[in-house]
């Protein structure tokens, strides 16, 4: 009896064990489903979060900022990466495509120069620095994005700005020195040189002009220089030297008279006018005679009024004939004469502009006799 009574209690634990296991299995399924649902929720929340916004600078500007932050003004590629990641949150995320952009901008832009490695630094790790010619693009910390083609425009405008800054409108003060109403006017020679050595034939001037002097001041010959400058050296004298000149000329408003000297010659040789010594009229000569004749100082004083230059069409070498006119101040003097000066291979542009500027009428009677050679 006792054995039969003890057996039934032993059976329920055996029967209850499968039920408990089944209940445990059913209870474990909701825990796995809950974990899966939590994972999907986290993925959805991560997908909705945007990465940090990209900085409002171009990659060129970012690289320049990194290089300029270094005391040595040069950085390696890894150091540039570290600077960008430490300063901008955009470069700290999982996106790594910005590194390719940095490398491409370093290698493809002329703003950056790859420095050669030292002997003690093998392998990779070149230093990068900024080209000195491109530093003006980032003056005063201007790193904002520029429109496309901005750098090309800057390079195109940089020589123009430097040229405009170097230019000045000081040509008149540099070329002319006005020292007052009765002072002198000096004109330094220009710096233009003729390609071919345009010289003046020394044979003509001694035969025609040698005897004519300025009472102790002979006329200096025009020296033929192989590389002489194309110039019009002129000096000024006071109005008392030429008393017969009009005061209505634009250049003679202050009483000063400007006279051309030694055109197409060196600055050393000049026709220097005497302050109180008049020109001496000599023995009459034939207008067309080019031979040398002695000149005597037996006539009254004369002053040089004006020299004309006109083109001789018969000469293929563009020969010019200058005809200076001499005006008599004395009413008793009736003789007039002309001296013909032959200047070969001379350009007439500057001489016309130089001699025509001080043309003015005379009160006395004048006559021009053309010479037909």
Swiss-Prot record:
Q: Does Transcription show up as a keyword for this record?
A: yes
Indicate where this protein resides in the cell.
Nucleus
Q: Does the keyword DNA-binding apply?
A: yes
* One GO MF term attached to the UniProt entry: DNA binding
Compositionally skewed regions (Low complexity) per UniProt = 13-22
DNA-binding region location:
54-148
Q: Which GO terms describe its cellular component?
A: nucleus
| PROSITE patterns (alphabetical) | FORK_HEAD_1 (PS00657), FORK_HEAD_2 (PS00658), FORK_HEAD_3 (PS50039)
- This chain belongs to the protein called Forkhead box protein F1-A
* Species annotation: Xenopus laevis
